[in-house]
């Protein structure tokens, strides 16, 4: 990647003789004279640069300039990201919206029980998954959870489980709130695929109040495993959920708490089934077929 970015070497066709096109699935664009497709997962760094490091913002900005100059086709996972690309100066004719898919794995009651035992979970729980970084809005989630257990009787026996690796952006307020919530919050770190599936299946609800994402795959995964979803209004996650999720202003912990109260209440089963049905419309087969159409168009010169 560094060689591509700094030296423009080696050229892709020297590594892949006989290739007819190149698809860059990250911001690392290989130099090439072949047709180039690029996946742009999101432009969150333009929407909220304060949620990224200065070095990261510089890298993303330079990469975006190269995408605009060099890509024949730009593949995005959501209409929200497509709209951001157009606002950033990308020609709409080069954009292709191809949503991600989801594939679940079988999970037994014993696996769920083992996960709960291993993590010391004796109560129902709200689940969050992701990398812990500012744009994920964990502080907003913690504030919402504190309101939920303080103000809603249904949440008396409820914990919060945070799954995923540490990212960047140490927040003293977040740390203090975690300390105040004590054993009601469980931070697991990264889980393997089987544990993660069990975590989704065992959750009473899933909350993902990110400020911005390119797609929000955890939301789709949660729906597929039957966890009612609370996520951010006005974002791509609302696009993924359709009518199957509960939407809240990510800047309003009280609104998030209210949606969570609904998700764990009498509407739980209906929301869970609606999420499963919605998730069935997102398949990797459809995703692959749509990519193949773009590739054929590039090779044929139609793009």
State what each model feature region is.
Residues 1-303:
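Carbohydrate transferase catalytic cores enriched for Leloir-type hexosyltransferases
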